[in-house]
UniProtKB/Swiss-Prot annotation:
This is Protein lev-9. One of its GO terms (cellular component) is synapse. Glycans are attached at N411. Its main location: other.
Amino acid sequence: MRFLLLLAISITYASALSCPEVTLSQRPKHCKKECIADEDCKRNKRCMCDGECGLSCVNPIAMCHPLPNIENGFIRTAGDLRFGSNAEYGCNKGYILVGASQRRCQANKEWSSSQPVCRLQLKCGPPPEIPFAVHDGSSFSGEYDLDAEVAYNCIPGYHKFNAKGLSISKCLLNRKNVAQWFGPDLRCKARACPDPGDIENGLREGDTFEYPHHVKYSCNPGFLLVGSTSRQCSSNGEWTNEPANCKATECSRPSSPLHGKVVGSSLTYQSVVTYSCDHGYRLVGQVQRICLAEGIWGGNEPRCEEIRCSVLPTLPNGYIEGSETSFGAVAVFRCLETMTHEGASKAKCMEDGQWSAPIPRCLASCRVPHIQNGKIRDKSEGQLIASGSKVIVECNKQHEANIDERLICSNSTWSHVPVCSPLSCHNWPPRVPHARILFSKSSHGSIAKYECNNGYHPNRNNQIIKCLYGEWTKDGPPMKCLPSWCEHPSKTYGTLPGGQILLEGILGAYEFQSYIQKVEEGRAISFQCGKGNYLIGPPKATCVNGEWMPKVSPKCVSQTHPMIEGKILWDRKKRSLPGRAVREYVDDELSTHRQHSGKCGIVSGKLERMIMQHSDNGVSVC
């Protein structure tokens, strides 16, 4: 498919170059739509040359029908029978072709012309063609009678190569009684010209010295060709035109620019000239130019223009003496009274068109500001201070500057104006043993609070300390954190009838004796009831910050059990019932007996009870 596409493209390109222009009236009826380019055609059609139809919209893969054989002849075709394919006809010996010798597959899928025929040759056809020669035959039909002769001669520019060769051809019958041309054996050869020679300081192109070939001449860089650039070997064996020569290139002498000059003595190829300007002028353009191979100076001619500096801007808080801007002019800068001059005092217009220095600054003075709770050292309020000067702020006693104490005057504006504020506390508040300090800032007026660690309590209610003018200050006696002790628990809970209070230690719990008056922070006591009693309230208490917690007083209450209807049969393996079975007999309304058993849980029957273990010597109903 790719091959067919390339074939179609090549055919289209060739068609556009060689296709005849056909008017609408000249186009045969079988022609397809006329076009100029592929865009004029639809679908898979392309704009291609269709013989006598000219450029037409055709299907490049259209196929023509196979050609029938020609009697006493043959047909040669190249490739398949697609559009544009040619069929060439020929006859066997003794026969001559009558009709078109070639036919072409057209866009309408038909072959051009009609089929030719081969008939017995009784006359000679056209005389044979001899390269670079012509004959004097004059038959308009292209057929010659027997014994007809034609003479050959070489065309101009060619000569007879074989001097003894026969230059005549004659129509005779061959052994098969078929008319045939015999002769000539003429050979024509192009006439030769003598060697044209080389060109000095140049190059010759072309090494064939025969008619009708050419030789071309060119010169080396720095030389110009004088004469014709080419010569042709003519039909008479001589070269046309006169020999050319290469002459060294020379540029014309350049003129000096106005207010300047040009330096350089040589004007030959690749010579260089240099331009310069008079004092007070500067060169605009190239400093140097070179003589090119074409005999002209490279680049454009420069010019000299007067050197001028830009007009200086106005000087705020000052003035400029001198208004000239030409080369060498001087401008003097002056500031008004009380202004500070910062920068150059004058500037000169230089050769590069720039001033030697930028304009200065005339800076206004600053007035000494009012400083609350302070002053400016060695200066009085409202006094003028020159721009660029530095002053120092001094704060009153027990005050400090909130930012840098050094002020700089810059063109009537101070770099900053600090505020003298009461001193901050730069040290931590005094440390108190067994306490921690809570505070977020240490500026004047800030407060800090003490909190005693666990097991300690403050010696006073006010636990606050305040920062005043750089010192941490507090009212009353010094803050202390004292150890916390709990008194005998009887003072909190009283006695525990039916039980006892135990003091817990590392090795266990023992009875809290009356002689123990204080217990340290974190110690614990437990409450325990005697047999037949159970505890109501907290089982333990802990000494926290000098108090027993929780403060709820426990009680020991004697145990009672409700009567259970029926009979309880004990499991005699053990007296207690920790998870053991118990059997209950319950009388129902029908005076029948049912036996139930189970662990502490629901016993089903007419009377429902929950039996649970409670003590070593009894059960109770839940």
